[in-house]
């Protein structure tokens, strides 16, 4: 879920940088257009389609503009470079990176030759090249270019100039997506300080960095800090831009996503619906920005176990993205994965498999077969087979995803840790404990080093290792790990979070299996209360906890208590089975 808020924040940040350059290059194009009678009309149409994100319509116009520039000004003129850059921008938004890169490089070569390698306009083109590499997962290239842009702008404008802040923000966003949060935070803080000084603490430009910094804290599960920043940004935008401005809707969406990740689904739903109403009004019902929010609403309903409602939102988001961005765009792939997960949880495995495979094909085509994106899709597909207990299919996919993550993201990255944990979980379920333990231990060590000993993902890894020891019958090793996980989750996520409920349930299992029924019962009861409150009384997770509680009562010889609890669990399952399509696998 977190990739959704982060992805939203990332695009909003990138669009600002793109928009600033577009404004500059379009202005230059219009000046040059006086020499060509049809150029003003072409530029006007291009601007309209670009700003409304109708890229499939903008592309042929941008191609025509470039052709005219080449004919009238020559292949090495700055005006031709501007047209090449604009066409590259369109291709980048369409996810056609192979077409975009040579155009950017051509524009860059011309600008460097005419203006020199240290000119601010060269930095603007370099910035777009860095965006391209960031989106294709070539982070080392992007980092090097952003650092060059920063050096140029600091020299040209000074270390405390808003242009410098723009680059600091972009470089911080790159580190954010690389999972290097310790590098990202001081850059965001510096950018925020510059903007507060240059524009004031309540300026919309200041709100941009508040949004990005908030997303960083969400990624670290520091929801208290994130909530305050998003609330401040929302207050600024509502006051300065109005409650119905698109940027106000972006902040509503970020705050809503924070509430979603905190398990506060009602708050999240209300804010997302507000943001949707604004965006539909300002951008239209079929705009990519509308698709972002529609997709996010789907994630809320999915988290609540309202899979049918989620499906309708994911289907709508998919339809918009396929139409506006194309069937092979990365954003289309993201929605395919979200819809696949929804079908997976509805036990419609054949539908889920088809969508996951399509999402994987998009990632392999756009980013490459050994990209972080492809590894993520392989992980999803492996998890689908795991849930179907098709371990023979699941294992090689996890292993392939792990090899890619280690190569692309690094052996100590959180992406690698996630795959290690999943592969360890697979071996645990297969009873291959000797294979599982070193993987789970390695995942825990990575999270501890990368995110800290009290991060929720560290808690999850500790809990996974505890579960493994419990399955091995090594209860003395398991208990302190489960207790550690619970302590972290209660502190960082809250006592009523769903992750807290899961750990309570696992700890209850440990005490049940060791015959410590007096300790197990209140843990099961507490987990049940949380799940009923957040998910509703008829959710499958509620039925699972009821089963655990019934088993406890049977073991204690309390059949009068066990019977109604067991019957309630069976009733929930029967109702769910009746209301879902027949399982397809």
Named regions from a protein language model:
Residues 1-585:
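Intrinsic-disorder-linked linear interaction elements in eukaryotic regulatory proteins
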């Amino acid at each position: 879920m977190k990739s959704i808020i982060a992805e939203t924040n990332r695009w909003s940040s990138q669009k600002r940088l793109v928009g600033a350059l577009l404004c500059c290059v379009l202005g230059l194009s219009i000046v040059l257009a006086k020499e060509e009678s049809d150029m003003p009309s072409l530029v006007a149409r291009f601007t309209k389609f670009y700003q409304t994100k109708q890229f499939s319509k903008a592309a042929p116009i941008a191609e025509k503009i470039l052709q005219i520039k080449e004919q009238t000004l020559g292949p090495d003129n700055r005006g031709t470079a501007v047209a090449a850059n604009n066409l590259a921008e369109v291709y980048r938004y369409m996810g056609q990176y192979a077409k975009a890169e040579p155009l950017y490089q051509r524009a860059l070569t011309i600008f460097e030759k005419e203006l020199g390698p240290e000119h601010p306009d060269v930095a603007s083109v370099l910035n777009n090249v860095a965006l391209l590499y960031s989106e294709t997962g070539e982070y080392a290239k992007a980092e090097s270019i952003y650092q060059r842009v920063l050096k140029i702008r600091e020299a040209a404008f000074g270390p405390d100039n808003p242009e410098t802040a723009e680059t600091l923000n972009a470089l911080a966003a790159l580190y954010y997506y690389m999972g290097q949060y310790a590098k990202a935070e001081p850059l965001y803080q510096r950018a925020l300080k510059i903007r507060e000084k240059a524009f004031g603490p309540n300026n919309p430009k200041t709100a941009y960095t508040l949004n990005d910094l908030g997303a960083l804290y969400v990624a670290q599960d520091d929801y208290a800090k994130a909530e305050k920043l998003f609330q401040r940004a929302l207050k600024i935008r509502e006051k300065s831009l109005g409650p119905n401005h698109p940027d106000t809707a972006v902040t509503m969406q970020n705050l809503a996503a924070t509430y979603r990740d905190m398990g506060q689904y009602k708050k999240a739903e209300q804010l997302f619906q507000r943001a949707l109403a604004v965006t539909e009004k300002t951008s239209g019902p079929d705009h990519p920005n509308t698709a972002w929010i529609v997709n996010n609403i789907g994630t809320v309903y999915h988290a609540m176990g309202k899979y049918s409602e989620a499906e309708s939102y994911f289907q709508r988001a998919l339809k918009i993205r396929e139409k506006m961005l194309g069937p092979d765009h990365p954003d289309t792939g993201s929605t395919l994965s979200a819809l696949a997960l929804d079908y997976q949880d509805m036990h419609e495995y054949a539908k889920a498999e088809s969508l996951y495979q399509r999402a994987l094909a998009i990632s392999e085509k756009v980013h490459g077969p050994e990209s972080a994106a492809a590894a993520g899709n392989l992980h999803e597909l492996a998890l689908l087979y795991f849930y179907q207990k098709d371990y023979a299919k699941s294992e090689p996919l996890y292993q392939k995803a792990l090899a890619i993550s280690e190569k692309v993201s690094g052996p100590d990255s959180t992406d690698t840790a996630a795959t290690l944990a999943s592969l360890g979980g697979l071996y645990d379920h297969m009873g291959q404990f000797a294979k599982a333990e070193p993987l789970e231990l390695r995942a825990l060590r990575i999270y501890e080093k990368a995110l800290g000993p009290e991060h929720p993902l560290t808690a999850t890894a500790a809990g996974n290792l505890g579960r493994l020891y419990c399955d091995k019958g090594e209860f003395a090793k398991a208990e302190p790990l489960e207790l550690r996980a619970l302590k972290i989750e209660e502190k960082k996520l809250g006592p009523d979070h769903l992750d807290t409920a899961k750990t309570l349930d696992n700890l209850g299992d440990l005490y049940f299996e060791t015959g410590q029924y007096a300790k197990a019962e209140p843990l099961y009861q507490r987990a049940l209360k949380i799940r009923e409150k957040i998910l509703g009384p008829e959710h499958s997770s509620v039925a699972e906890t009821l089963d655990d509680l019934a088993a406890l009562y049977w073991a204690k010889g309390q059949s009068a208590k066990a019977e109604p609890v067991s019957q309630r669990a069976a009733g929930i399952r029967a109702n769910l089975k009746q209301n879902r399509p027949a399982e397809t696998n």
